[in-house]
Design a protein with these regions (language model features):
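Class I SAM-dependent methyltransferase SAM/SAH-binding core
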Residues: 59-63, 67-110
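Conserved class I S-adenosyl-L-methionine
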Residues: 2-55
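A short, conserved alpha-helix within the catalytic core of class I
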Residues: 130-138
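Short catalytic micro-motifs in class I SAM-dependent methyltransferases
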Residues: 125
Length: 264
């Protein structure tokens, strides 16, 4: 079971709706793969830094792996990875995108891994769906002593007016709400949480931006009429941007926020 709680995760939302939203992504796996960005290699390198020097090849569990956006960066970095997600449809997409990486169905609160079996547990765009007490405890169980918990999110930079308007239309995500309230909670057995920020941009067409919107839990679980209205408003916004006309592309600015905490 995936748990979400607290005002940062949608005050007033019933628990069953939270669970539905957190496990809804498999229905839009193709949109997720097409529309969601990867992660900066520098952010992944920073998260793994505490264990990189002491391990010949870092053993990493990518939890809430989705279609493998973070998994492929870990593989490129030379890590020995296993990917876990509560949704088999997302893992099927991951197996196509990142062949050869073992996959496991499971959640951050109940990892199907032995005690002290990995050097790092990482979650990309996922910890906001996790009960931080249970997730921290379970990450601590599967990590070896001195192992690291790494959390990372790609957040669109709302200082750009058209990006702010796009977010307003799509509705701010649970992750964005959490960041606005100070960031993720990481509890025992972990100590101090360090953080680092990385800024970058991704060139996207109007079609790719729509796929990104369709990959968000709010749209996936919305009623058909609401989904059509949101997509219509997004198309109207994109029609006002000269860069997106005639199949053109625009730079979507991102702020990637990475966090890490070491298990004693």
């Amino acid at each position: 079971m995936v748990h979400v709680y607290g005002s940062a995760y949608g005050e007033g939302m019933e628990p069953v709706n939270r669970r539905e939203m957190s496990t809804s992504f498999g229905r839009a796996a193709a949109s997720y793969e097409a529309g969601r960005p990867g992660y900066p290699a520098a952010a992944v390198e920073w998260m793994l830094q505490p264990v990189a020097a002491s391990a010949a090849r870092v053993r990493v569990a990518d939890v809430g792996s989705g279609t493998g956006k973070l998994t492929r960066v870990l593989v490129d970095a030379g890590a020995e990875g296993v990917a876990g997600d509560p949704d088999p449809l997302m893992l099927a997409a991951l197996a196509e995108a990142v062949p050869g990486v073992p996959t496991l169905v499971g959640s951050a609160e109940q990892l199907p891994l032995p005690d002290a079996s990995v050097d790092a547990v990482v979650l990309g765009q996922a910890w906001h769906w996790v009960d931080p007490e249970l997730g921290s405890r379970e990450a601590g169980r599967v990590l070896s002593a001195g192992g690291v918990l790494g959390l990372v999110w790609n957040i669109r930079d709302g200082k750009t007016p058209w990006v702010a308007r796009m977010t307003e239309i799509m509705h701010r995500s649970n992750a964005e709400e959490m960041m606005a309230e100070g960031g993720p909670d990481v509890l025992a057995p972990f100590g101090k949480v360090e953080t680092q920020t990385f800024t970058w941009s991704r060139s996207m067409t109007a079609a790719a931006l729509l796929e990104m919107a369709r990959s968000r839990s709010f749209l996936i679980t919305a009623a058909d009429a609401d989904r059509a209205r949101i997509e219509g408003e997004l198309s109207e916004l994109f029609a006002t941007l000269p860069e997106l006309q005639d199949g053109g592309a625009i730079d979507l600015p991102y702020v990637t926020r990475a966090f890490r905490a070491v298990r004693p």
